[in-house]
A protein has these predicted regions:
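Thiamine diphosphate
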Residues: 3-166
Length: 166
């Protein structure tokens, strides 16, 4: 568990797993904004689509906060939201299987963790040509943490797989 010994992180483990700069005294973000951004826009879009289409399934690999799905949003989706834990391979396989079964699937996934699912991207998704959408989040050469969370290998990796439009 993360956050041991820091009261705000112990009280709000999920929010502190991935956080913007904050005031150490109270754990509050240094900058707060009510402006829309890519995360809030993605969250709002997904929630709207879930309400419009009972066949929509949203999948996460233990990173729902990257597309704005905190506990409230996940509960609002009911059984239209599935978290496969830290298992991107399972996420891609679940995405393709559900799509082949008729579900409309969206699987937002972090770029930095996508290499874990290369075989499934190629063999489950591309070769099967399953109709699904996979927004890749956190792409780019800048990361809030360290080199392990840079998200720039997604482009050469995914574009090397025939049948996937990226």
């Amino acid at each position: 568990q993360k956050g041991e010994g820091y009261a705000p992180a112990e009280a709000h483990r999920e929010e502190f797993h991935f956080s913007a700069p904050y005031d150490v005294a109270d754990g509050e973000p240094l900058q707060q904004s009510n402006e829309s951004n890519y995360i809030t826009d993605t969250r709002d879009y997904l929630l709207r689509k879930v309400n419009e289409n009972p066949e929509l399934l949203i999948i996460s690999s233990a990173t729902p906060e990257v597309f704005g799905f905190m506990e409230k949003e996940r509960k609002a989706c009911g059984n239209q939201y599935v978290d496969v834990a830290i298992a991107e391979q399972t996420g891609v396989s679940t995405m393709t299987g559900a799509a082949r079964g008729g579900a409309k699937v969206i699987y937002p996934v972090m770029a930095t963790f996508l290499q874990r699912a290369y075989d499934q991207l190629e063999q489950d998704w591309a070769m099967d040509n399953s109709p699904a959408v996979m927004p890749v989040m956190g792409t780019g050469i800048r990361a809030l943490t360290d080199l392990t969370h840079l998200g720039f290998w997604d482009i050469p990796m995914i574009t090397s797989i025939p049948e996937i439009v990226y």
